[in-house]
Amino acid sequence: MYRIKDEWGEFLVRLARRAVEEYVRHKRVIEPPEDTPTELWEKMGVFVTLNRHNVPPQMALRGCIGFPLPIYPLVEATIKAAIYAAVDDPRFPPVQPEELDELTVEVSVLTPPELVEGPPEGRPKKIKVGRDGLLIEKGIYSGLLLPQVPVEWGWDEEEFLAQTCWKAGLPPDCWLDPDTKVYRFTAEIFEEEYPRGPVRRKPLV
């Protein structure tokens, strides 16, 4: 059962696109539209991903920022995440206006992270590639990978755990440490088929 209707997903992708374009072109932060569905004012976690169109998935990423926890209303979080993905992802220079025609927008609406319980060696059996995203925390370090990432890269569950450790700045086997907390979550993902094109729900498998 989907939490986010297809029309809401399209609304969020269009909103994220407009937020990016207005900020990149005019340094203007848009306001939530008056016709925002009531349900999208609920607090939810969300990530916005910008991808280069017609580029292999492993090379397509142009920016990805979001909020793992439901701390903002979804409509506001989507605007913030979209702008941050365009100009504040430390892995990339800010998006330039001439790039906008070549980028697709993807919005992932997250469920709250759930702690993976039990002994560390059993963690791979308690997550599933194609369903779960991961958040790993140890001390001051944390890292998150969305559910679509291991699918695009062809990882199994152990590699997914190792790569999330690496994303957190930790050794790849840190998921075997009892002091490392591993959380799983799911996401409903909506994407443009091509820049400014139709929006579809993205299947993971």
From Swiss-Prot:
Cited Pfam families: AMMECR1
Cited SUPFAM superfamilies: AMMECR1-like
Domain of life where this protein originates: Archaea
Entries under InterPro entries matching the protein: AMMECR1 (IPR023473), AMMECR1_dom_sf (IPR036071), AMMECR1_domain (IPR002733), AMMECR1_N (IPR027485), AmmeMemoSam_A (IPR027623), Uncharacterised_MJ0810 (IPR023472)
Segments forming domain AMMECR1: 7-201
The protein's name: Protein TK0174
